[in-house]
Amino acid sequence: MARLQAFKDPSFHSLVATFRSLPLIRRFVLGLILLLICQQLAVLTWRFLLPEDSRIVGVSVTPAQAKEKPATPGDFTLFGHAPDADASTVNDAALSGDIPLTSLNISLTGVLASGDAKRSIAIIAKDSQQYSRNVGDAIPGYEAKIVTISADRVVLQYQGRYEALHLYQEEEATGAPSSSGAFNQVKDEIQKDPFSAQDYLTISPVTEEEVLKGYQLNPGKNPDLFYRAGLQDNDLAVSLNGMDLRDADQAQQAMAQLAGMSKFNLTVERDGQQQDIYLALDGDH
């Protein structure tokens, strides 16, 4: 009796991919539907393929090419291991009260937030370079270090005080919109409640003799985005960027690499034929 190999380490309870400006409506729709698909796939892999004692909280991700500490399959921290020091005391202090925004010339382009501080990662951009950093790590070019990492910000310790660095802080400060109002509304809704993604998209694992055949995609109660993305009822998702979502190891690798992807190719089976849905964040698709 065939069985899928369980993931060796905890994976994502939820995965929320936040795309920056998508000028064309097709890119907007495909980007949002991909957000929903990846979030739902992450929840399903966590439910069906992980050990019973796995525990993980919300994750927030933006497509970014992180440098240093490369990801390896089976390692949830993706880019390396955080220091062993217990920062629980300083974490409580850093998260209480209002914290001023940092004036450092850096931006936060991605976050992987875990209930275990040692597993959380911040992707920080400075001078056109991007770096992955854990709690306790130093900020490139500054005598500052990361104190806490949460779903939408990191808290830094710089010159004896705490400062906050938020996702899209630079865009919010200049008043520039990061995406359309509709995208922000759905993104915020999913970030607050990951399972609300089911209002737009439902995903069900399809098995045959206990072997996973793929993930069946269907519209939720708000089906407009589903159909505008070119999806059809009962499409069967089988791979992402060439990695087989039906294989536990490859599915884990696909989820782990999402933070560094700028091009996405979701393959679905439809009426016995494979169809590709393609999105390039840096192109005109």
Swiss-Prot record:
Keywords: Cell inner membrane, Cell membrane, Membrane, Protein transport, Transmembrane, Transmembrane helix, Transport. It holds the Pfam family T2SSC. It is found in: Cell inner membrane. Residues 49-285 are periplasmic. The chain crosses the membrane at residues 28-48. InterPro entries: PDZ_sf, T2SS_GspC_N, T2SS_protein-GspC. SUPFAM superfamilies: PDZ domain-like (SSF50156). Residues 1-27 are cytoplasmic. One of its GO terms (cellular component) is type II protein secretion system complex. GO terms for biological process: protein secretion by the type II secretion system. Involved in a type II secretion system (T2SS, formerly general secretion pathway, GSP) for the export of proteins. Required for the translocation of the multiple pectic enzymes. NCBIfam families: typeII_sec_gspC (TIGR01713). Belongs to the GSP C family. This is Type II secretion system protein C. It comes from Pectobacterium carotovorum subsp. carotovorum.
